[in-house]
């Protein structure tokens, strides 16, 4: 209940029902940073706690089933703090650690979650605005990025040797193809960024983010772990010679098959 987002929202929903008798279930209001699925879970938790205050509330019927059986369309991620506002792209920012409402290109729920277990240091809009990749990114996607750095001190941002994201609740019967893009305009030095994808096996690829408008890294036929998880790690590449060893993540497209 001390969590600044869903914890406080759950507490507020509980007080609403206890003080007024009005259940919060179904209310459209949700604080910034809380998606619709998380909001419903908070509302249901508060309502059931009020209904049976001396018992642990059973929440097993709320949300998606334990094992994901959904076969989604293309899943697109836009990384950065400026929302793109396009329904077929999932905006992933620094102010939220876990996203539980991930949709595919048709706006259908996928049941997949994305959690920044080791978050990036910050965000910018300094990527390429015109790109030549098979990802077909609009400018609002290709130019926005999350960034990190691993050496020295850069402003108030914390140095992190790597960032890590966990894709959870994947359909364990499917394989996944990843296409990942990183870009940062300007500068004569290398901002090479390495990406590691780890499911049942681990693979690594690198690209040059400096002034990149065409290169992507691809991982094919990635099998999730038995519990439906794939890890994505982002870090400076071996040829990165930027002063603080900056690394970037702008966009990602996942195809399930």
Report residues per predicted region:
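A short beta-strand element within beta-rich, extracytoplasmic domains
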Residues: 163, 170-186
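Conserved catalytic region of serine esterases and O-acyltransferases that act on ester linkages
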Residues: 1-75
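Short, surface-exposed beta-strand/strand-loop-strand elements in extracellular ectodomains
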Residues: 165, 182-203
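Residue-level detector of buried hydrophobic side-chain packing
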Residues: 11, 79, 176-180, 195, ...
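Low-complexity, Gly/Ser/Thr/Pro- and Asn/Asp-enriched, turn/coil-prone segments
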Residues: 67-157, 219-257
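Short, flexible loop/turn segments at beta-strand junctions in immunoglobulin-like
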Residues: 167-171, 221-223
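Extracellular carbohydrate recognition and processing domains
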Residues: 202-223
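Surface-exposed molecular-recognition determinants
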Residues: 145, 160, 164-166
């Amino acid at each position: 209940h001390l969590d600044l987002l869903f914890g406080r929202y759950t507490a507020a929903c509980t007080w609403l029902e206890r003080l007024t008798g009005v259940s919060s279930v179904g209310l459209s209001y949700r604080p910034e940073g809380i998606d619709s699925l998380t909001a419903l879970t908070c509302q249901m938790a508060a309502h059931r706690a009020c209904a049976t205050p001396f018992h642990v509330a059973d929440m097993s019927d709320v949300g998606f089933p334990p094992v994901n059986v959904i076969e989604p369309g293309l899943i697109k991620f836009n990384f950065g703090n400026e929302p793109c506002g396009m329904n077929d792209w999932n905006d992933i920012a620094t102010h939220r650690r876990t996203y539980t409402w991930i949709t595919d290109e048709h706006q259908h729920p996928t049941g997949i979650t994305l959690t920044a277990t080791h978050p990036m240091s910050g965000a910018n809009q300094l990527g390429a605005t015109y790109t030549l990749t098979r990802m077909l990114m609009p400018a609002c996607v290709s130019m926005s990025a999350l960034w990190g750095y691993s050496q020295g001190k850069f402003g108030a941002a914390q140095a992190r040797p790597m960032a890590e994201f966990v894709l959870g609740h994947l359909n364990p019967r499917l394989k996944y193809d990843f296409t990942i893009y990183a870009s940062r305009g300007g500068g004569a030095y290398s901002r090479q960024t390495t990406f590691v994808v780890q499911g049942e096996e681990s693979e690594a690829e690198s690209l040059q983010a400096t002034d990149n408008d065409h290169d992507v890294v691809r991982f094919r036929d990635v099998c999730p772990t038995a519990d439906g998880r794939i890890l994505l790690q982002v870090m400076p590449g071996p040829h990165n010679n930027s002063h603080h060893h900056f690394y970037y993540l702008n966009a990602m497209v996942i195809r399930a098959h």
